[in-house]
């Protein structure tokens, strides 16, 4: 894992005022490769627009991700571009210790100065990849289940 590369996905939360903040992060296959994914994807790229609402008690973070990746059809073995456009939200509550309460709520140490979102971009992107991969040319045929 290239920690120097991943630093560019850090948000300096200590210095932010209690307000709304906008960030934009471009990413590509290199980010996804940092996490040793077992999922067969290639040539991925995208943009993650982050809306961060900071208060005394928490960070309300919305991830708006648009991107694409190259997939292989399960039936025809043809490669195709799969486009993604989705939003996810996480609440980061300030506490004494880091603890993941649920997928949507995480406690982070209130002394933490930088929130690195690379892992979340990776996880959200990977979870949006369909399990059943069908090339668009056969996706709408009557004999194919969607």
Where are these regions (language model features)?
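Acidic and generally charged, gly/proline-rich low-complexity regions
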Residues: 1-146
């Amino acid at each position: 894992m290239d920690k120097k590369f991943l630093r560019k996905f850090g948000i300096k939360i200590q210095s932010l005022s209690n307000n709304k903040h906008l960030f934009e992060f471009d990413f590509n296959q290199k980010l996804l490769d940092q996490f040793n994914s077992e999922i067969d994807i290639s040539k991925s790229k995208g943009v993650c627009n982050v809306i961060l609402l900071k208060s005394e008690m928490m960070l309300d973070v919305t991830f708006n991700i648009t991107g694409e990746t190259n997939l292989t059809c399960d039936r025809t073995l043809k490669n195709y571009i799969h486009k993604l456009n989705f939003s996810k939200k996480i609440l980061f509550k300030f506490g004494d210790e880091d603890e993941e309460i649920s997928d949507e709520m995480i406690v982070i140490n209130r002394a933490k100065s930088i929130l690195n979102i690379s892992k979340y971009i990776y996880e959200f992107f990977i979870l949006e990849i369909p399990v059943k991969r069908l090339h668009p040319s056969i996706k709408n045929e009557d004999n194919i289940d969607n």
